[in-house]
């Protein structure tokens, strides 16, 4: 092979590898977003320790409703959305939001 052809082939191969790597990385992000975040749930947590609460309805990413509480220490815990205490916590937060 002539040197210009070899350089062109090398450049094309490098470009192809970069595109393949970029495509794989992008696919990995999508795949990780399309699954449930809560593998284990807690039936209760002290209301005073909750900094914020996120409720994610069922969708293509996960068949269950997910309730994720961020505690004042920064730790995130998954709560059981069917637990009576968790439902009371959600109602308290909703009522607190309506009062403001």
Swiss-Prot record:
Q: Name one GO cellular component term.
A: extracellular space
Biological process (GO) annotations held by this record are: cellular response to interleukin-1; cellular response to lipopolysaccharide; immune response; inflammatory response; neutrophil chemotaxis; positive regulation of cytosolic calcium ion concentration; response to amphetamine; response to estradiol
Q: Which PANTHER family match?
A: C-X-C MOTIF CHEMOKINE 2 (PTHR12015:SF194), SMALL INDUCIBLE CYTOKINE A (PTHR12015)
Question: Using the chain's own numbering, where are the disulfide bonds?
Answer: 36-62, 38-78
**Localization:** Secreted
GO MF annotations, alphabetized:
chemokine activity
What the entry lists under SMART domains is as follows: SCY
Under CDD domains, the record lists: Chemokine_CXC
- A Pfam family hit: IL8
Q: Which family does it belong to?
A: Belongs to the intercrine alpha (chemokine CxC) family.
The protein's superkingdom reads Eukaryota
Keyword Secreted set for record = yes
Give the species this sequence originates from. Mus musculus
- Coiled coil segments of this chain: none
Q: Keywords, A to Z?
A: Chemotaxis, Cytokine, Disulfide bond, Inflammatory response, Secreted, Signal
- Physiological role: Chemotactic for human polymorphonuclear leukocytes but does not induce chemokinesis or an oxidative burst.
User: What quaternary arrangement does the UniProt entry report?
Assistant: Homotetramer.
Q: What is this protein called?
A: C-X-C motif chemokine 2
Gene3D superfamilies, per database record? 2.40.50.40
Signal peptide coordinates: 1-27
């Amino acid at each position: 092979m002539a040197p210009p052809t070899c350089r062109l082939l090398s450049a094309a191969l490098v470009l192809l590898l970069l595109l393949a790597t970029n495509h794989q990385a992008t696919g990995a992000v999508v795949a990780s977003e399309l699954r449930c975040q809560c593998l284990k749930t807690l039936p209760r947590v002290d209301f005073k320790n909750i900094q914020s609460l996120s409720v994610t309805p069922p969708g293509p990413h996960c068949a269950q409703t997910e309730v994720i509480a961020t505690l004042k220490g920064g730790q995130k815990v998954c709560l059981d959305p069917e637990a009576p205490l968790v439902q009371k916590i959600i109602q308290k937060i909703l009522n607190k939001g309506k009062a403001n």
